[in-house]
């Protein structure tokens, strides 16, 4: 289901991934807003983006974030900035609780193909 209002696009379709899922909440030429849910023990690939930076706000759970080989621990109401071209990943190390992140992407392109994977536990690295 898509609802269009001026340049914003609101989507209610849940996109499934091996680590969990995401929903695109809003998109314009200047930003893309996602709600990301990482299942218990889920791990996103160690990746970078050429055309976008990301702001992650932790909504629920505890995130272990690897940013350029440095580890950060973030909980609800905390945030981190991921500059474009920075290598990064997030892990949900909980055995039972989900991790929920609001991601704000800024940059010149917001494409799922703008992912360079360096490692991935689900076999998706190139």
What is the predicted role of each segment?
Residues 1-34, 43-46, 115-126:
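A short, N-terminal "cap"/entry segment at the start of jelly-roll beta-barrel domains
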Residues 12-16, 89-126:
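Double-stranded beta-helix
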Residues 37:
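Short proline/glycine- and basic residue-enriched helix-capping loop/turn segments at helix->loop/beta transitions
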Residues 42, 51-52, 70, 86-87, ...:
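A generic "binding-loop/recognition-motif" signal
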Residues 51-64, 68-69:
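Glycine- and acidic-residue-biased ligand/ion/polar-headgroup-sensing regions
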Residues 69-87:
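Short acidic-glycine-tyrosine-enriched beta hairpin
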